[in-house]
Amino acid sequence: MGRRLILDTTVLIAYERETIDRSALDDDELAVASISVAGYRAGIELADTVDRAAERARALTAITSTVDVLDYTEATAAHHGRLLAHVRRSGTARGAHDLIIAAHAAETGRTVLSHDAKARFGDLPGVTFLDARSLATRSS
């Protein structure tokens, strides 16, 4: 078994667009937070064409059928609260959804895989980060 990873929404989008080397994740244990599924579903709802919405829906089904979808539980809330307190004390603004993803990562001992280096997941206590740009396909 390879790495234990949690994919954020940017990676779901890269999966759909085929701009990430999926084979690089073959040996890894993958999960996605339900908040990321919600963010991706918003993209389905906002698609500019019916065909595009259908493509996105198919991609999401393919992803969620092969990875664990993590629900927000009381244990997740405990990690989330700790991270909220940390960012408030440090005065560093963070995305609300990013903190939920980070809470799942801390709770489950997973590394956050994201294209969003600005989210600074690795700066959060108990959270590790892997830059998904290292897994980009050659054409992206």
Locate each region found by the language model.
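Short, well-structured N-terminal submotif of metal-dependent ribonuclease cores
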Residues: M1-S36, A42-T61
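Active-site neighborhoods of divalent-metal-dependent phosphate/nucleic-acid chemistry enzymes
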Residues: R3, D68-H115
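Histidine- and aromatic-rich ligand-binding microenvironments
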Residues: L7-D8, V32-A33, A93-G95, D116, ...
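Generic structural signal for small/hydrophobic residues in well-ordered secondary structure
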Residues: D8-T9, Y40, H80, A105
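A generic structural signal for short hydrophobic patches within well-formed alpha-helices
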Residues: L12, V37-Y40, A77, K118-R120
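Short, structured coil segments at secondary-structure junctions
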Residues: D26, S65, L124-P125
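Conserved beta-strand scaffold positions in the cores of enzyme catalytic domains, especially
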Residues: L30, V69, G126-F129
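Acidic, PIN/NYN-like endoribonuclease modules and their adjacent C-terminal/linker elements
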Residues: A102, A106-S140
